[in-house]
Structure formats: structure tokens, C-alpha cells
UniProtKB/Swiss-Prot annotation:
The gene is idi. NCBIfam families: IPP_isom_1, PRK03759.1. This is Isopentenyl-diphosphate Delta-isomerase. The active site is at residues 67, 116. One of its GO terms (cellular component) is cytoplasm. Homodimer. It comes from Escherichia coli (strain ATCC 8739 / DSM 1576 / NBRC 3972 / NCIMB 8545 / WDCM 00012 / Crooks).
Amino acid sequence: MQTEHVILLNAQGVPTGTLEKYAAHTADTLLHLAFSSWLFNAKGQLLVTRRALSKKAWPGVWTNSVCGHPQLGESNEDAVIRRCRYELGVEITPPESIYPDFRYRATDPSGIVENEVCPVFAARTTSALQINDDEVMDYQWCDLADVLHGIDATPWAFSPWMVMQAANSEARKLLSAFAQHN
């Protein structure tokens, strides 16, 4: 895969430039654009993934299905599709917006900061998974209610962005409705 960049943003969310993805994620990460997606299978189960140990931020942590960064000139929806193919080897239905104004800042145990405007999407898988081990070290298909209960009971076991997304009542309601609509 070619070198990825992040789109830097000002405080109002207006693009101000780009920076190479790995150079962008430091202890002083600038605000940038990202996306987060929750994928469901035909049974309505959520794909929960465990980040590869080689990941710069939050290695080995359980998280929602796939996250990434749109490239310059690429829509968020196209970025979701691209990363699903790259990380999971899977085709998906058109991504649907779940939490369009999600924004967060979090610091992982090594000091790496995520500082993102990060719209959240949901989609369904339409093919079998072909996991990229450089991105994902493990995965599970789970009932959404069980995952949400797990997040509520043990938030430390999941990525901070997944916990924050699940804490939003409107996003939680939309994810539940999406999971039930087969």
C-alpha cells in the first residue's frame, strides 16, 4: 500500500494541509481527519477486531471493526471501503453515517496521542474476511448488546474511541437499529 497521509485540520475542522501518517502520530499529534466504522454481518453481529502489536498507537487493543484516515480528495465513505479491503479483505455495503460529529483526543500508554475529527459509520460485510495480519491480530463476531455491555463493564479493555462512541446515546441507538435491520 502506498504511503498514507492525514489531512490536518484547524480548530473549526477546516483542512490546513497534510502530513505523513506515521509522522503525524506523536506525543503532540495535530488535529486531523479520520473515520471509524462498525461492521455487521448478515446475522447482525458486530465485527470486533484486536489491533496488531505492530500498530503505533494502542497495539493489541480490542476495538470496533476498522478505522483510518481519508486521503486528500477521497470521501469518508470511499476511505471506509478502501480500509475495509486493506485491513479485512472484505467488501461492504455503502457506509451509513452513525455519528458524524465525533471528535476526540486520547493518549495511549506509550504517550502517542490521537487527536481526531472522526465521523463514525456502519456497514454490512458482503464477502468473507481475509484478515491482514499487519493490521489485525484477532477478531470476533459478537452480538452488539454483549459488546456494549462489555464496554460499560470494562472500558479499559477497548480502544478509547470505541468507548467514547458507544457512550453517545444517539450513536448507540443508531448502531442497535442498524444491527437489527438485516
